Amino acid sequence: MTQSLADMRRDYTRDGLAEAQAPGEPFALFHQWFADAVKTEQPPVEANAMTLATVDGDGRPHCRVLLLKGLDDRGFTFFTNYDSAKGQQLQANPYAAMTFFWPALERQVRIEGRVEKVTPQESDDYYQVRPLGSRLGAWASPQSRVIASREALEGLVKATEARFSDTQPHCPEHWGGYRLLPERIEFWQGRASRLHDRLNYRWVDGQWARERLAP
């Protein structure tokens, strides 16, 4: 390593986040920030990439990067194999946290809340707009399970291709969406000298309460 980890840092120099810039509820601000990220972030950064954290039945945390695939006034939607490790963890503990980080904008958004499955129709609607290879992969891959080799996985894909050679694959019952229903959303804007701006929204008694947190 050519540089000490202790010496690795960058200073943040973009504009701050004042209460006057923030609406009373968080979804409008998220939409604004997300639109900024789509316009500003460049590959390899994906604006809709997020880290999803879950906790299993033994209280052990797990995290991974996923893509946000839906957003409305109910919450934030992602899709996966329901039999996967994350699916089993959400079955045992239906709460999760997700984090978006947009480095070019020096912004981060943290979201916490309860998670529920979307309707089968919502899952099928998204499944049908996926590329064919991804739709076949949802059938072929026993996600999170141990497999013998890459060749074994490719064999499963070929078998799935043969199965659906004369028909379009439909959405499997073990695959679909989850929606995180936010109870807390924090907007973080990097500032100089690590004195960052943090505006936190909490869902309290049926409405959003906004507060500033110390950096």
Swiss-Prot record:
EC number: 1.4.3.5
This protein's UniProt keywords: Flavoprotein, FMN, Oxidoreductase, Pyridoxine biosynthesis
One Pfam family of this chain: PNP_phzG_C
Cofactor(s) it depends on: FMN
Catalytic activity: pyridoxamine 5'-phosphate + O2 + H2O = pyridoxal 5'-phosphate + H2O2 + NH4(+); pyridoxine 5'-phosphate + O2 = pyridoxal 5'-phosphate + H2O2
UniProt pathway: Cofactor metabolism; pyridoxal 5'-phosphate salvage; pyridoxal 5'-phosphate from pyridoxamine 5'-phosphate: step 1/1; Cofactor metabolism; pyridoxal 5'-phosphate salvage; pyridoxal 5'-phosphate from pyridoxine 5'-phosphate: step 1/1
SUPFAM superfamilies noted in UniProt: FMN-binding split barrel
Binding of FMN, residues: 64-69, 79-80, 86, 108, 143-144, 188, 198
UniProt remark on cofactor binding: Binds 1 FMN per subunit.
Function: Catalyzes the oxidation of either pyridoxine 5'-phosphate (PNP) or pyridoxamine 5'-phosphate (PMP) into pyridoxal 5'-phosphate (PLP).
NCBIfam families listed in its UniProt record: pdxH, PRK05679.1
The name this protein goes by in its record: Pyridoxine/pyridoxamine 5'-phosphate oxidase
Naturally occurring in which organism (per UniProt): Pseudomonas putida (strain W619)
